[in-house]
């Protein structure tokens, strides 16, 4: 007899004994023995057979039963109903067959392998018993005392089913589920019985299947309404939909559909109460497409389905363009072209059902609050055409000039001290977000592509409430957008536009594919000519900013991008600031390792020359392959710079480069050169330095240097060398194959001597 030992190691056959020693050992060979017993198939399955003599090695008993066998208990799950097979096995089995509608096991259409596995599952998956006392070892053990079943698994298994694997359930969408339900309601008896094996053909319901209530209940109306929204070209009405899709609103279902993605015509506040009763939002007395406006004003949004994964544009959905091709054009034609502001609702008169004209100049004047029109003017032809086109659309009492397709707020957040941000719409209608590129100062940057195949960078910024820190970040983001919207320079990343939704703001920028200088000098050794070419372009972009009284305040290699032509572009204007006439600032902004002494000292003011100090640190970073003060932590750097100490300049650098860096890192602000002065330095012009360099400001070079920077960006490739004898351009500053091996390692000597840390360890 095979016994189950009460050992704590027992788990599904772990303590079964073998048939040779009668179960006294724990070799774990009981499971193969039982499998061989099942595979014999020497008996026919007979319901009337007496199974009481089934006491061979295949039977299972618990040692805690003291010789008396427990009543077996087996459980079968059939169509979410539980049926137990007890001691009266014969009658219970007949009842079980009657329940499932079969007369013999072969009618169950279960394959032979499934028959064995399901039999084992019934026998060996009984609930856990209470702790029992092992008779052999005399100690308590919490074993799984598997209760036996008297089902004879040695009996003849039924024939294999035509399908060896169960058919996966057919997943239906909303429209198919509704059609499937209607098929059940109006089902006709069929000639065949049972489920077909083909998943493409549905089985008919049984005759006793309960009929569905086809009355227009709330669920039925809402489901029908959602179906009409997706299938019919007719616009839905404001309020709950009737079963027939008419404009009659059902009060009991008002506001029960909170997940609709449709928007409807709305009116300004303090209007009739029926709009609140027919609101699509659950009992909150607010329309679903309401936008917070001054003086309780409401504005209608586009009824086009909006796709959050693409863009916030009203014409970005291809399905909506096919269903309503003229909607966006009508909305744009009826919108106010110069301003999207809505007049004060308190000063707005009671509007008639029909309007005489929708011209913007007539609506710009605010009439008296108590004035009433003497007669109803004729309705605008565009409103009539729109009503005829959409059939059941409720006639709105809003002037069509106030019905705009898309509301663009004049600024992201109202911060009093920040410049106003006018949203610039990108030149595309549909765009898709691609791979993650990196993280900027206030958001993550992704790659994007528009419907015409143009690639760009997308900075994604969350607009959720993040406390005081989040408000400050949004405020600085306003500065970045305001500054970038007015900047057009080949050495500054181009701003393409913005879009926003309820939670995020998307800033579209020019995509610069080769990454930042910080990532490039880790891959390549920047030689002298490369550093000189990049520095000249950085100076060109800085001069453009300084001429417009803009301080970048975060110049470093990580914020300078390079394209495939070797043109550098200043990026990440989150720290930039446009100063007043005095040009002085006191705010503590920037990265510690690149900060000027006057920026670190809170008692001192600084101006555009703070960017010159950061430029010197950036040139030193490109030359050495590491950040300035790379071996120090931020607080140590701030202490050193605050006391007037600059980063150490290696002695093995070229004289022109060392002199250029030392002049940029001048502690005294009055002795620090400007961009115009640095553009005449021998390190930039390529002339040999014969003695101490004395920089003299040359105003006449302002226009020339800017023109040269434009010529530089338009050069076809950086691999061509300059043939003229004048100051070389960026193309002439490029590295030729012969000059690569001149000083490949000289500018990286200091990195190994001082064991500087990588820029990733420096918090910007």
Swiss-Prot record:
Coiled coil: none
Extent of Low complexity compositional bias: 60-76, 125-135, 715-729
Catalytic activity: L-seryl-[protein] + ATP = O-phospho-L-seryl-[protein] + ADP + H(+); L-threonyl-[protein] + ATP = O-phospho-L-threonyl-[protein] + ADP + H(+)
Class of enzymatic activity (EC top level): transferase
Inducing factors: Up-regulated in response to chitosan.
UniProt biased composition (Polar residues): 184-201, 752-764
EC number annotated for this UniProt entry: 2.7.11.25
Segments for region (Disordered): 1-81, 120-260, 325-348, 360-392, 706-764
Chief location bin: membrane
InterPro entries recorded: Kinase-like_dom_sf, MAP_kinase_kinase_kinase, Prot_kinase_dom, Protein_kinase_ATP_BS, Ser/Thr_kinase_AS
Knockout-associated phenotype: Reduced chitin-induced MPK phosphorylation. Exhibits chitin-induced cell wall-associated depositions comparable to wild-type. Reduced accumulation of PAL4 and CHS transcripts in response to chitin. Double deletion mutant MEKK1a/MEKK1b does not phosphorylate MPK and is unable to induce the depositions in response to chitin. The growth of the double mutant is inhibited within 1 minute after chitin exposure as in wild-type.
Subcellular localization(s) per the UniProt record: Cell membrane
PROSITE patterns named among the record's database cross-references: PROTEIN_KINASE_ATP (PS00107), PROTEIN_KINASE_DOM (PS50011), PROTEIN_KINASE_ST (PS00108)
Positions that bind ATP: 437-445, 459
Key words, A-Z: ATP-binding, Cell membrane, Kinase, Membrane, Nucleotide-binding, Plant defense, Serine/threonine-protein kinase, Transferase
MF terms in GO: ATP binding; MAP kinase kinase kinase activity; protein serine kinase activity
GO biological process: defense response; MAPK cascade; response to chitin
Family statement: Belongs to the protein kinase superfamily. STE Ser/Thr protein kinase family. MAP kinase kinase kinase subfamily.
Function summary: The CERK1, MEKK1a/b, MKK1a/b/c and MPK4a/b proteins are involved in pathogen defense. The pathway induces rapid growth inhibition, cell wall depositions and accumulation of defense-related transcripts. This protein is required for responses to chitin and acts redundantly with MEKK1a.
Protein name, entry field: Mitogen-activated protein kinase kinase kinase 1b
Source organism of the structure: Physcomitrium patens
């Amino acid at each position: 007899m095979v016994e189950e030992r009460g050992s704590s190691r027992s788990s599904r056959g772990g303590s079964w004994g073998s048939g040779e020693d009668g179960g006294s050992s724990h070799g774990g060979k009981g499971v193969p023995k039982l499998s061989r017993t099942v595979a014999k198939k020497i008996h026919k399955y007979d319901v009337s057979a007496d199974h009481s003599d089934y006491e061979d090695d295949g039977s299972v008993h618990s040692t805690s039963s003291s010789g008396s066998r427990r009543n077996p208990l087996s459980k079968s799950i059939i169509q979410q109903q539980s049926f137990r097979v007890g001691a009266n096995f014969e009658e219970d089995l007949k009842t079980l067959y009657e329940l499932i509608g079969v007369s013999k096991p072969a009618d169950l259409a279960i394959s032979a392998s499934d028959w064995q596995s399901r039999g084992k599952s019934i026998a060996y998956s009984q609930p856990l018993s209470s702790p029992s006392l092992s008779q052999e070892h005399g100690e308590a053990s919490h074993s799984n005392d598997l209760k036996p079943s008297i089902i004879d698994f040695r009996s003849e298994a039924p024939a294999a089913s035509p399908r060896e694997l169960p058919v996966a359930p057919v997943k239906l969408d909303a429209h198919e589920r509704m059609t499937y339900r209607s098929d059940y309601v109006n089902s006709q008896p069929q000639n065949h019985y049972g489920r077909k094996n083909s998943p493409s053909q549905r089985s008919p319901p049984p005759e006793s299947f309960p009929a569905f209530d086809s009355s227009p209940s709330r669920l039925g109306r809402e489901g029908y309404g959602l179906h009409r929204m997706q299938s019919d070209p007719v616009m839905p009405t404001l309020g709950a939909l009737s079963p027939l899709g008419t404009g009659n609103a059902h009060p009991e279902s008002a506001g029960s559909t909170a997940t609709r993605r449709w928007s409807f015509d709305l009116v300004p506040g303090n209007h009739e109460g029926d709009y609140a009763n027919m609101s699509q939002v659950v009992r909150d007395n607010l329309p679903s497409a309401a936008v917070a406006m001054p003086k309780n004003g409401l504005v209608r949004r586009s009824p086009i389905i909006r796709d959050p994964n693409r863009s916030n544009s009203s014409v970005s959905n291809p399905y909506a363009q096919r269903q309503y091709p003229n909607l966006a054009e009508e909305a744009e034609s009826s919108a106010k072209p110069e301003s999207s502001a809505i007049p004060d609702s308190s000063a707005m008169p009671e509007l008639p059902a029909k309007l005489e004209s929708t011209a913007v100049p007539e609506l710009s004047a605010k009439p008296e609050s108590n004035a009433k029109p003497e007669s109803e003017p004729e309705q605008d032809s565009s409103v009539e055409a729109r009503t005829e086109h959409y059939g059941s659309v409720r006639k709105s009492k809003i002037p069509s000039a106030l019905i705009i397709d898309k509301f663009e707020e004049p600024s992201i957040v109202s911060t009093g001290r920040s410049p106003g941000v006018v949203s610039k719409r990108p030149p595309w209608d549909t765009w898709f977000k691609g791979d993650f590129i990196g993280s900027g100062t206030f958001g993550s940057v992704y790659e994007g592509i528009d419907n015409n195949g143009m690639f760009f960078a997308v900075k994604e910024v969350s607009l959720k409430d993040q406390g005081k820190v989040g408000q400050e970040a949004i405020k600085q983001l306003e500065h970045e957008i305001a500054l970038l919207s007015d900047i057009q320079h080949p050495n500054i990343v181009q701003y393409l536009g913005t879009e926003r939704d309820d939670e995020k703001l998307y800033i579209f920028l020019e995509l610069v594919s080769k990454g930042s200088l910080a990532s490039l000098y880790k891959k390549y050794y920047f030689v002298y000519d490369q550093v000189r070419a990049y520095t000249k372009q950085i100076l060109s972009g800085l001069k453009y900013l300084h001429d417009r009284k803009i301080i970048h305040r975060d110049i470093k290699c990580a914020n300078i991008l390079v394209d495939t032509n070797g043109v550098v572009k200043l990026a990440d204007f989150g720290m930039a600031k446009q100063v007043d006439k005095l040009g002085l600032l006191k705010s503590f902004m920037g990265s510690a390792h690149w900060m000027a002494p006057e920026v670190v000292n809170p008692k001192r003011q600084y101006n555009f020359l703070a960017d010159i100090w950061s430029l010197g640190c950036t040139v030193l970073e490109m030359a050495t392959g590491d950040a300035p003060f790379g071996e120090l932590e931020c607080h140590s750097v701030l202490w050193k710079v605050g006391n007037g100490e600059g980063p150490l300049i290696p002695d093995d650098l070229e004289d022109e480069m060392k002199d250029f860096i030392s002049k940029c890192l001048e502690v005294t602000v009055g002795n620090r050169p400007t961009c115009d002065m640095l553009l005449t330095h021998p390190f930039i012009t390529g002339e040999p330095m014969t003695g101490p360099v004395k920089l003299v400001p040359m105003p006449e070079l302002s226009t020339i240097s800017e023109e040269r920077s434009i010529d530089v960006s338009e050069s076809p490739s950086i691999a061509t060398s300059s043939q003229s004898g004048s100051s070389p351009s960026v193309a002439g500053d490029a590295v030729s194959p012969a000059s690569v091996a001149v000083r490949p390692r000289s500018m990286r000597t200091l990195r190994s001597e001082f064991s500087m840390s990588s820029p990733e360890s420096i918090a910007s």
